[in-house]
Amino acid sequence: MCIRDRKFTDYKSSISRSPNKEPLWINSSSSEMSGPLFSEKILNKNDNDLTLNFSKIGEKPLGQEIFVHGFVKDENGNNLKNVLIEIWQANAGGKYRHQNDPSNIKLDENFGGCGRFITSSDGYYIFKTIEPGAYPYSNRGTEWRPRHIHFSLFGSMFLQRLITQMYFEGDPLIKSCPMINSIPDINARKLLIGRLDLSKTENEKILGYRFDIILRGKEQTFFENKREGS
């Protein structure tokens, strides 16, 4: 993981993955600048339900079911509609459905680990998923990455893409994670933590987490591909 010109020396993979040459600026095409306009028409029925969108009929993935929900806002607190949100995550055991995941943890055949949703007219979004597991990484010996979900947000055009991660309130691994702790502002780190929301608990089985996303301003969510303060 690299935030433009920032490399996290404690997370060695960020050094090997970071570009070593100056970026090339390419003029954007008119289609990139003017579209697309997202609407619910591009969504499939269960795109925001990760407990169903990859599972076999009559089966469900393993793990604690959760709701992750919130609002996408601008710096003035205005809710933003028609924002395409895509998420991806590890399964309950901490395994990604990706060919480059070196973990020996078994894949959950009923969990794909990705979903998408378009914010409603009041900027609201919601996903039903499985609480992801933490997983070890070899950059600094026996350390683990805390539970997290990756978020990608598209605005009214493909050039407006922002990427971030949501962590889980109370996870003891957060304090030792070099990625979130590379953010110097402790208040900015707090904005990346999804808060337990018991009002969203359903049928005494599904836990709720609230994660609002602010795109600009002093209280903006920290994005991996956007400079601080921009």
Question: Where are the predicted features?
Answer:
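Beta-strand-dominated extracellular/periplasmic modules and repeats
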Residues: R4-S230
